Each structure stands twice: as structure tokens, then as C-alpha cells.
């Protein structure tokens, strides 16, 4: 049995691979058509102009769905492992809410480009990155609370390092972007897709975009740490029938149907 066939480990793997492919495919398309510069554009800039905008939107929406699925499985796993720990239960619920909000922001980024509705696009990006960062932080606290009985110390330290990486990237991005957009670097700096080294604010732009890419890769690394955990969990779906027909009838007891969530049982 391959490693990705064990439990639900394919979920975080698919999330990372699919999201990375989204960024790479839209980047290659935008570069090939000369819609952006090769040197570190904003991630969303590679999905601003058709046809890469269509590709970016569709693929990023699917990534958001994969993200919610991954976070929900993580929520169910932590809940099953700690059914009576009040602190862990509260943190686990908070983590799920933060994760869903982050995925909502990701979907907003996918569907509202900065060239059309800039405010909505920025709100989506802030939601995705900020809630995603807090989600990582909460999950790291959960890892600390559950080690060494359930989680190994190594997993906690790896996740802590990834959270620190994410925090440094976020701080760099916020600082440089605030200076870039609040200073007098021209009226089109917000919508600008092509930058030259002699342009005002070029260095700030590069640092901001580099921090954005760096932050995204810290997310990738964090979700990859879920693979080993997800090898030890499966989910099932249960159909409860209220009658023997689909007409309006008096409810009668019938046998419930139970099948694996994905039509096969990974053991």
C-alpha cells in the first residue's frame, strides 16, 4: 500500500500539490503572455488578466474546498483523540472557524481580481493570510497540548518553526506593503503589473512579493505535517432512512445504510 493510500493522508497532499500547481500554472501562463514580470510578481497578479485569470480562479476555488475538507478532518481527529479536554475542545473549534474563514478569503481572492474589485480582493487576501496564520498558531498550540502522549515533540517543534517562518514573512509583507502604498510612488502603484528596477518603490515591491511567496510556502510546509497524522484516520458517512419510499408516509424503522465516506475503506 502506497503512503497516500493510508487513511486520509491524500487530503493534505492533494491540497498542497493542487495549490502549488495553481500558482505555477498561472505564473507560467502570465509570464509567457508577458502579462507580468518574471521577477517575483504578486501571486494574485498572475491571475489578473485572461486567460490565466480563468485558470487561477477555477483552481484556487478547488484549493479552497480541499482546504476546508482537510481542516474538517483535522478537527474531527483532534476531537476524537481528546473528547473530554475542555481547553483542547475550545481551541479545536476555534481552529476550524479560523480555517473556514481563511478558505473563504482564498475564494474571494480567486473570484475578485484587483483590477475589477480591489477592495474585495484585498479583504479576501487579508482574510486568507491572517486567518490562515492564526489557524497555524492554534494548531501548533494543540500540538503542544497533545505532546508527548498523542503528538511527538518533533511534530510540535516543526510546526512551531513553520509558524515563526509564517510570522516573519507576514510582518515583512505588512511593513513593506504599508510603506509602499502609503508613500508617494505614483497613482498607479496599486494596479501596477510591470515593475522596472528604476521605478520608485521597486525594492519595497520585491520585498513584499517575496514575503508573500514565502508565507505561502510556510502554509504548504505546515499542511504537509498533516500527512503522517492523516494516515491514522478514516471517516464514514451514514444514511438514515425515514421510510421505505420517497413519498409522504408514516415513518417506519428501517435498516440504516453505512458505507465509507469515499466508497472504500483505507486500512
Curated annotation (Swiss-Prot):
Q: Which PANTHER family match?
A: DNA DAMAGE-REGULATED AUTOPHAGY MODULATOR PROTEIN 2 (PTHR21324:SF10), FASTING-INDUCIBLE INTEGRAL MEMBRANE PROTEIN TM6P1-RELATED (PTHR21324)
What does the sequence similarity comment in the record state about its family? Belongs to the DRAM/TMEM150 family.
Please name the taxonomic classification of the source: Eukaryota, Metazoa, Chordata, Craniata, Vertebrata
* Pfam families the UniProt entry points to: Frag1
Q: Where does it sit, as one GO cellular component term?
A: apical plasma membrane
Tissue expression summary: Expressed in the retina.
* Any GO BP annotation: phloem or xylem histogenesis
Q: Which domain of life is it from?
A: Eukaryota
Where does this protein reside within or beyond the cell?
Answer: Lysosome membrane; Photoreceptor inner segment; Apical cell membrane
Q: What does this protein do?
A: Plays a role in the initiation of autophagy. In the retina, might be involved in the process of photoreceptor cells renewal and recycling to preserve visual function. Induces apoptotic cell death when coexpressed with DRAM1.
> Keywords on this record?
Apoptosis, Autophagy, Cell membrane, Lysosome, Membrane, Transmembrane, Transmembrane helix
Q: What is its main location?
A: membrane
**Positions of transmembrane segments:** 8-28, 53-73, 87-107, 118-138, 160-180, 203-223
Topology versus the membrane: Multi-pass membrane protein
Q: Which InterPro entries match?
A: DRAM/TMEM150_Autophagy_Mod, Frag1/DRAM/Sfk1
Name the species this protein comes from. Answer: Mus musculus (Mouse)
Protein name per UniProt = DNA damage-regulated autophagy modulator protein 2
